[in-house]
Amino acid sequence: MKTEIDAKTVKKLRDETGAGMMTCKQALTENHGDYDKAIESLRLKGMATADKKSSRNTNEGLIYSYIHTGSKLGILLEINCETDFVARREEFTDLAKNISMQIASNPEIQVVSLDDISDLTKIEVRKFENAKDDLQNKPEEIKNKIVEGRVEKSLKKQVLLEQEYIRDPNITVTEYIKQVVSILGENIRVQRFTRYVLGEID
């Protein structure tokens, strides 16, 4: 028996995901009207689309400035896309704002991606973890595995793209960006950011 998909549900799905009406209706139909499964289906398809676009050049975009409540913390963010048309879209500006808020919310965030962490920092973190008392009597192989796991966890705390997205902890910042890529149809890249705290001098 064919599942009837009402327009209200399709519109709700479109509003939540940003996908087109026909795409939302198809997702609901394919999942027999199951709303949660339709969302997951669109999310996965969006990420697949985003992965295909990830190699495209991003020479446009904007410098976004965000001042946190109280005016004692500010973020300057450079975020790039492929065309000036997309750079002017509300969805792109919202993305820049939400990422800036993400950075402002967590002072541990220091870099955009894992590749931005220096080799010296990685060495220092590894030395610190190696020296912990609870590992000294462990067999070397087990110790190394534990250390690697702890190092990865420690480094990820510094990385913007690895964070749980503040507006939806079920996804990472990377996954959130991919969702926006699937909506706008262009590659998007967070290039760099600077955090300014009142009274702090580098």
UniProtKB/Swiss-Prot annotation:
GO CC terms of this entry: chloroplast; mitochondrion
Record keywords: Chloroplast, Elongation factor, Plastid, Protein biosynthesis
SUPFAM superfamilies associated with the record: Elongation factor Ts (EF-Ts), dimerisation domain, UBA-like
GO molecular function, one term: translation elongation factor activity
Subcellular localization, as worded in the UniProt entry: Plastid, Chloroplast
Its biological purpose: Associates with the EF-Tu.GDP complex and induces the exchange of GDP to GTP. It remains bound to the aminoacyl-tRNA.EF-Tu.GTP complex up to the GTP hydrolysis stage on the ribosome.
Protein name: Elongation factor Ts, chloroplastic
Lineage top rank: taxon: Eukaryota
Organism in which the protein naturally occurs: Phaeodactylum tricornutum (strain CCAP 1055/1)
CDD domains, per the entry: UBA_EF-Ts (cd14275)
Protein family membership: Belongs to the EF-Ts family.
The keyword Protein biosynthesis appears for this protein: yes
PROSITE patterns given in the database record: EF_TS_2
